[in-house]
Regions:
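N-terminal low-complexity, acidic/polar interaction/targeting segments
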Residues: 1-168
Length: 168
């Protein structure tokens, strides 16, 4: 898959997010994916200050994403709207034709086990996130309501992680 290095952002499965892309390798990756209507593989950089990352500058777990919309801006950069599909892990990554190409394996999500431990952890997670949201004051009540309505545990964890202010 064409691979897009990201700085200071992680895209999770089921997340829809606009990205601003300006580096030639990144634009080439988008163009390659769109030419074949393929998904793109999004990998966070280990150090976001690295201007021209190599394969060793990228994390090994990322997100396979669908490109929903592309808008070329007058300054030569591209605004792209992506939706995370599933988590993936790099098997191999190489630089070819001015872009990164990755062979990716799917990362298995944990099945929703029907046991009391999982349910207790889920309740604790929701309570802790609610407290975090009250302290943070930047998370709207509708987001909290949406999160409380998510039944799938993997999706719940990804959605909460997407709303936390964490450093990579």
């Amino acid at each position: 898959l064409a691979t897009l290095p990201l700085r200071d952002v992680v895209v999770y499965p089921h997340m829809v997010l606009p990205l601003f892309v300006g580096r030639p390798k990144s634009i080439a990756a988008l163009e390659a994916a769109m030419a074949n209507d393929d998904p793109v593989f999004l990998l966070a950089q280990i150090d976001p200050n690295t201007e021209d990352p190599t394969a060793s500058d990228l994390h090994r777990t990322g997100t396979v994403a669908q490109v929903l919309q592309v808008l070329k801006l007058p300054d030569g950069t591209v605004k792209v709207l992506v939706e995370g599909i599933r988590r993936g892990r790099v098997l191999t990554i190489e630089e070819s034709g001015g872009l990164f190409l990755s062979h990716v394996e799917a990362v298995n999500e944990y099945a929703d086990a029907d046991n009391s431990d999982i349910e207790a952890i889920r309740r604790t997670l929701l309570t802790q996130f609610d407290q975090y949201a009250k302290l943070n004051k930047k998370i709207p009540a509708e987001i909290i309501n949406t999160i409380n309505g998510i039944d799938d545990n993997s999706r719940l964890v990804d959605t909460i992680a997407a709303h936390l202010q964490l450093k990579l």
